[in-house]
Design a protein with these regions (language model features):
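Cleavable N-terminal export/targeting peptides
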Residues: 1-29
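Gram-negative (and chloroplast) outer-membrane scaffold detector with strong preference
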Residues: 29, 38-40, 59-146, 154-158, ...
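N-terminal targeting signals for Sec/Tat export/insertion, comprising classic cleavable signal peptides
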Residues: 33-59
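Outer-membrane beta-barrel and related beta-rich outer-membrane complex signature
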Residues: 48, 84, 126-128, 174-178
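Solvent-exposed, glycine/polar-rich loop segments of beta-barrel outer-membrane systems
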Residues: 129-136, 177-185
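Internal, hydrophobic beta-strand segments that form the core of beta-sheet-rich folds
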Residues: 166-167
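Short, solvent-exposed beta-strand-terminating loops
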Residues: 171
């Protein structure tokens, strides 16, 4: 009887030891992922000064495995620009389609990452002034660029994490629109940076 009890206790102990890695899993990066965040942004056009902005954004992703994730990210910010080709009250939007690379370990509750994306960048300007002439219509600048970024996820549990992200976008504004008038040969260098603080969830 004693041998049976010892054997049973040993089997229970082995089962507990075998189950520990599953129970200890602290993070996941696989499957569908959604997130929301606050955004702090800067924008610099040509040789002008940096202009600061605030706003928020949304994140949608799908992790094919522990490392590689395809994502779509939208960020919107609002700020004033006083020394650019178009002055006024600016609202800027970024739409990123890209790939994120996680340096993941499922037993660790923090996961750093790097990402790269192609970005559409659109600016709408209210109360616009072009060459010292006030515009009756809103003015829009449209362009594209490449975004490089990185960040770190801090997991509260296996599927819910705080997300800290820094992204930099370089590119050009190539089209300007004012009402029904459009000019497609614009060539304005523009750099923008975003610092995002939010949460991310794997349902």
């Amino acid at each position: 009887m004693r041998r049976v009890l010892v054997l049973a206790a040993s089997l229970v102990l082995l089962a507990c030891i075998g189950a520990r890695p599953v129970e200890a899993q602290a993070s996941t990066t696989r499957g569908f992922n959604v997130g929301i965040h606050f955004t702090g942004s800067t924008l610099k056009i040509e040789d002008g000064d940096n202009n600061n902005a605030g706003g928020g954004g949304l994140w949608f992703g799908y992790g094919f495995n522990r490392t590689v994730q395809l994502f779509l990210q939208f960020d919107g910010t609002q700020f004033d620009v006083n020394d650019a080709a178009v002055e006024g009250d600016w609202t800027m939007g970024h739409a990123d389609l890209g790939v994120r690379f996680h340096f993941a370990n499922s037993l660790r509750s923090w996961v750093p990452y790097l990402q790269v994306a192609t970005t559409a960048r659109v600016v709408s300007v209210q109360n616009g002034v072009v060459n010292d002439v006030a515009q009756a219509d809103d003015v829009s600048l449209v362009g594209a660029g490449i975004t490089l970024g990185g960040g770190i996820l801090f997991y509260f549990n296996e599927s819910f994490a705080a997300d800290l992200q820094l992204a930099w976008t370089g590119g050009k504004f190539t089209r300007i629109e004012a009402g029904s008038v459009s000019y497609n040969d614009l060539n304005l260098d523009a750099q923008s940076a975003r610092f995002n603080v939010g949460v991310s969830w794997w349902p």
